[in-house]
Swiss-Prot record:
Family: Belongs to the glycosyl hydrolase 43 family.
Keywords, alphabetical: Glycosidase, Hydrolase
pH dependence: Optimum pH is 7.0.
Temperature characteristics of this protein: Optimum temperature is 35 degrees Celsius.
Record protein name field: Xylan 1,3-beta-xylosidase
Amino acid sequence: MTTTIQNPILKGFNPDPSIVRVGDDYYIATSTFEWFPGIQLHHSRDLINWRLVGHALTRTSQLNMMGMDNSEGVYAPALTYSDGTFWLCFSNVHSCRGGNWMATPSYVVTADSIEGPWSEPVPIGNYGFDPSLFHDDDGKKYMLNMIWGGRAKTNFFGGIIMQEFDADEGKLVGAPKTVFEGTELGCTEGPQLLKKDDYYYLITAEGGTERNHAVTVCRSKHIWGPYEVHPENPILTSRFQEHAELSRAGHGFLVETQTGEWYMSHLCGRRIPNPEGYQFMPKYDNGFSILGRESALQKAHWQDDWPYIATGKTPVVEVEAPNLPLHPWPESPARDEFIDPTLSLISTLREPVSEKWLSLSERPGFLRLKGRHYLYSRYEQSMVARRFQAHNATVETKLEFKPNTPYEMAGLCAYYARNGHYFLKMTANDLGERVLQVVGNINDVYGEYSNDVVIGDADTVYMRLELKTQWYQYSYSLDGVDWYEIGPALNSTPLSDEGGPDIFRFTGSFAALFVADITGQKRHADFDYFEYLEH
C-alpha cells in the first residue's frame, strides 16, 4: 500500500510555509499576523504527520503589535539552518493599508533549538515584507527582500533585492542590488534562495495571494545574477483550475529528503461557496476561505536543471509520500479543563498572556479572564482563541459570570477580525437582569442577531458554537443537559479572507473566549473548560 501525504498538512490559518530539513527532522514556520505568540513552528519526521512545537516570538521585546489593525503584524517568516543555528527572518508590518508606503521593519532571530529560546531581533532593513537569509558555501550570508512602494506605478511590488549580511556584526553591508524584477504575473514577493549543483535558484511568490497566486522559479550560475526564468513558469498555481480543491496555491519552497526525494511546500486555500440563495461579496462567488490560508506539500522532480511539480502545475490533495519511516504524534486533547499552568493551542491578540488580564491560578481549574476593551479595539482585548481547522466543528464552554450592567459582557466568539465576528454574550440589561444575546460586526456594521434571553439571576451558562461549513449556529444551556438555539444560523462567509472589501485579509477564523468591561473595573469571568471537536 502506497502511503500518501494528505493536504493540507497544516490545516486552518497557517500560511506562507517556510520549510527546512535538519538531519532527519523537518520544520515549517508559518505566518501569524496580529496574533500572539508570533510565528508558529511545526515539526515532522515523515512529511505526513506534523505537530506544533512552539513559537519563535514570545516576548514583546521581540514583537510589539499593540495598536495594529487586522492582518498587520508578522508576515511570511523564512526559516533556515546554518552553523548549528536556526535563523528566522520576518517582518512586523505596520500600516499595511498605506498605499505607496508601508512601515515594514524586518528582523532576524536565532536559536540553537527549534523550541528556543529565540534571540532578541536584529534589524535587517525596512524595504518591504518577506525577508529571507541565504547561507552560501563560502560562509557568506545574504538577505533577500521584496521592495514595496515609493514609485508612481500601479504595481507597488518593485522586485527582489539582495544584500550581504554580516552575521558577526549583525548588520547589512554593502549596497542592495535588484536581482529580479519579477515576471508579468506581478506582485513578486516571498523570495528564498536555494543552491543545487551549479545553480542558484530564486523561488518567489507572484500573482497576489488570491486565485492567481503562483510559484515562480528562476536560476543563475552566479548569486548576483542575471537570473533566467523557468521555461514553464509558473511551476505551481491554481489559476488554471477555478474550482481546484486546493485554491490560491503559491509562496513555495523546496526541500530535499535524506533519501534524495524533493518536495515543495506552499500555501493554499479550501474555499466554500455562498449558501444557496444567498449572495455575499459577489466578486468572490468562486468561493470563500473561511479557514484562511493553509499549508500543503507537493512532490517535485528535476529535469534539465529545473524543478517541476510531479503531478503538474495544479496542486493535488493526495501526494506520494517519501520513503521514510512513519512517525505519528500523539493527538492534541479536544478538551482543555484549565488544570495545567499553561494554555494549549491558544493564541491571543497583539500581546502575550499576562496576569493583569488572565489567570489560571486565582481559581484553580478555571480560566479567569478580566474584562478590558471591546472586540472592535486594536489594543487591550481579553481574548484567548483557537483556530478553526475544519469546515465542520463544534466548540463548547461553561461560563460563570456576574454582570451588573450592559457594559460588562463575556462569552463565546466566532472571530476573524475586529470588524468580522459573531459573539454570544452574557451581560445584564438596563434593569440589571442577566441576559444572553448574539451580536456581531460585519465590515464595520454592528448587528444584533437575537433578542435578549433573560436568564434571571443565573450566573452559570453553557455555550456552544457549531460551524456547519456555510453557517454558524449558537446554542446555550443552563444545566449542560437541555440545549436551546439562540439567534438564526449565521453565514460563515463574511468571516473569511474574501469576506470584505478590504484586500488586506490574510488570517482565518477562530473560536474565542472573550470578556469585556468598558467601565474599566475589569470584572472577571471564569471558564470551566474549552472543547473543540471536528466532524
